[in-house]
Amino acid sequence: MVLNANTQFQNSFNEDLFDSIKNPVKTSSDKEELSNSIILTTLNDFSNWARLSSLWPLLYGTSCCFIEFAALIGSRFDFDRYGLVPRSSPRQADLIITAGTVTMKMAPSLVRLYEQMPEPKYVIAMGACTITGGMFSTDSYSTVRGVDKLIPVDIYLPGCPPKPEAIIDAVIKLRKKVGQETYFERAKIQSFHRYFTISHRLKPTYSVEEQLKAKELISNRQENLTISKKKIKESEEIFLQF
């Protein structure tokens, strides 16, 4: 009698069919149940996975860069696939996107929004005007030369304005950064990052030459005051003699 592969397969199939009819409810072993119901991971990896998949941004748009970000909401780019849900309250957001020029009068409100966001929080500086002040950085007396002077920035996105594809790339890089964080590093970053508080009042700074001129004027005024005091004393002494 010659057995080929087909007859062996048919015999094994008949045995499996007989076993299924004999015992229709199979009981799986403990090892199979444990392997199918247990996930081995760390607390850092699990929390990072949950956070990077649900970044809720707060949109702080002040100029034309914000229009490019609004293009992501459409069906062409569909930023919902990255878990981005725009929020109108800073208390519900963990990401703030600054897009546009930031003036000194707007700086306290930006810092207040950043302080009201829960930890951990992230910042994306979008556009040349936000990063360096842009074309307003040379002659303007009321423009902040970079939003990183007010709040710590995690991702810099240059451009005037940057394209929606670049914004998606910045979000992907931020997701990679969030996925590699640990609790120790997060606490270290929070203590390292310092930013202006609400009580701080920004004032325009003067050049070095103007500061030197102001010091000379103050010193000349003090010298004139001392000379005038001496003359007054001399005149009083002369008057008392007569």
From Swiss-Prot:
Source organism of the structure: Chaetosphaeridium globosum (Charophycean green alga)
Pfam families for the chain: Oxidored_q6
SUPFAM superfamilies: HydA/Nqo6-like
Family membership noted in the UniProt record: Belongs to the complex I 20 kDa subunit family.
Molecular-function GO terms, alphabetical: 4 iron, 4 sulfur cluster binding; iron ion binding; NADH dehydrogenase (ubiquinone) activity; quinone binding
Protein's cellular compartments: Plastid, Chloroplast thylakoid membrane
Record protein name field: NAD(P)H-quinone oxidoreductase subunit K, chloroplastic
Keyword terms of this UniProt record: 4Fe-4S, Chloroplast, Iron, Iron-sulfur, Membrane, Metal-binding, NAD, NADP, Plastid, Plastoquinone, Quinone, Thylakoid, Translocase, Transport
Summary of subunit composition and partner proteins: NDH is composed of at least 16 different subunits, 5 of which are encoded in the nucleus.
Residue runs in coiled coils: none
Function according to Swiss-Prot or TrEMBL: NDH shuttles electrons from NAD(P)H:plastoquinone, via FMN and iron-sulfur (Fe-S) centers, to quinones in the photosynthetic chain and possibly in a chloroplast respiratory chain. The immediate electron acceptor for the enzyme in this species is believed to be plastoquinone. Couples the redox reaction to proton translocation, and thus conserves the redox energy in a proton gradient.
Any one Gene Ontology cellular component term annotated for this protein: respiratory chain complex I
Cofactor note (record): Binds 1 [4Fe-4S] cluster.
UniProt-listed GO biological process terms: aerobic respiration; electron transport coupled proton transport; photosynthesis, light reaction
